């Protein structure tokens, strides 16, 4: 009986959040261990479907770096990185598009649809579909400057590495109206039809900004942002984040992630969240409990 009462209390705790967020859009960047382990993949699919069933509109943007690396290795192609970005020549770009837009994207769609019921379905997209992601070649020197990583100019031609120029939300809105869950591969295209490999964090940020989403949520392999003492920060604003970057508390691969959060907030997204995707049902635990489990970032 006590367990039943406890379950009822959990549902009651979630009720105000369900009421608050019904009809809102959440953009979720899916990556890391949450994409690799079978039990976490199932938990993620269940979380996404739960959001949709209670009236929240989830939009998924996924990564796929390890899968790209594995395919390149199988094909005998070398993976080269500069400052965490994959140098992407034309041949590598073809593999990136095949892996992200095909193998990874469709596996996520199939997983969600396996557990979906009734009239809800997931559908896979790349930037080419409906002109969703207009991209351009990344200004690598400016990118590294913003990340506090200053590199010699001659090292900065990364090939088909791009950045988002524009998000056309029309196809996403049509899918939402028809009860589909969009699953987006971070491949963009320019007006000449050239394909670009784009950091999925910044695609998620741009999509959230274009949709004026309530939240953008990043699944990672860490507990959240850490303060100067190494403790997880439950809530933080942009001013403090910038100070922590200047002081070297936030560094390395976390800088692009928090920059993506800041970019989303600057475009009208209400909150950004960094969650530990290694925790089953981390999305539900963050959104529908008072304490949460990760770090929320506000303006």
Curated annotation (Swiss-Prot):
Its EC number is 2.7.2.8. Belongs to the acetylglutamate kinase family. ArgB subfamily. It is found in: Cytoplasm. One of its GO terms (biological process) is arginine biosynthetic process via ornithine. It comes from the Bacteria. One of its GO terms (cellular component) is cytoplasm. Its main location: cytoplasm. This is Acetylglutamate kinase. It comes from Persephonella marina (strain DSM 14350 / EX-H1). Catalyzes the ATP-dependent phosphorylation of N-acetyl-L-glutamate. It catalyses: N-acetyl-L-glutamate + ATP = N-acetyl-L-glutamyl 5-phosphate + ADP.
